[in-house]
Amino acid sequence: MRFFRLPGVYVPQEDTALLLEAFSRERVDHGAAVLDVGTGCGVLAVAAARRRARAVAVDASRRAVLTTRLNALRAGVRVRAVRGDLLTPVSGGRFDLILANPPYVPVRGGRRPLRGSGRNWAAGADGRALLDRLCRGVPELLRPGGVVLMVHSSVCGPERTVKALEKGGLTAEVAARRTVAYGPVMRGQTPWMREQGLIGAGDVRDELVVVRGEHLT
């Protein structure tokens, strides 16, 4: 299926594909509750619904929410797409699987834009402005036996994500890796990231990772 995308909505890229592959390896029972955080075009949410899950998609962008609803309609599946800040719209909910592809690119000044395409990728001075919030909030939303899959750049420190999830009571590990060439966004931040020591002088490729956390019964 070719996904429709309104202007300004995050374009599915290598991180989307890596997370989708990791998701395909997870067991999804009929009627399982699956949450897609930072849904963008709704690729992961639609994939979950196709596996007969009860899919909920969250994004801060109105256009992303509308895009996801339209793509679910085109795919002939049901997805509940809601607008809001990370996990806030699903506070108090419980899920069997949580998928997250949050903004993770470090930016000079550390501020996240309130609007515009930069909101799709800018994530503070160390790229963890949203990752750390997710790590703190995810454990209480997972049912016993539930799993979280979170994709981000190795620049953000996969070990920090693992430790943060473990602090929340989950078992955690890096479940998938993929090395890709820097895209336009990362290339734009390269000089500053080199100044900050976030990447090496000769680095021109990025390692994407999927961190898997599980709420053991």
Predicted regions mapped to residue ranges:
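Conserved Class I SAM-dependent methyltransferase catalytic core
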Residues: 128-186
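Conserved SAM-binding motif I beta-strand of class I
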Residues: 54-59
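A short acidic, Gly/Pro-enriched loop at the edge of an enzyme's catalytic core
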Residues: 87-98
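Conserved acidic residues
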Residues: 32, 96, 146
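SAM-dependent Rossmann-like transferase core, predominantly class I methyltransferases
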Residues: 1-51, 64-67, 88-89, 191-217
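Mobile active-site "lid"/loop adjacent to the S-adenosyl-L-methionine
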Residues: 102-130
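Nucleotide and nucleotide-moiety/phosphate-recognizing core
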Residues: 53, 69, 73-74
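Conserved SAM-binding strand-loop segment of SAM-dependent methyltransferases
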Residues: 76-86
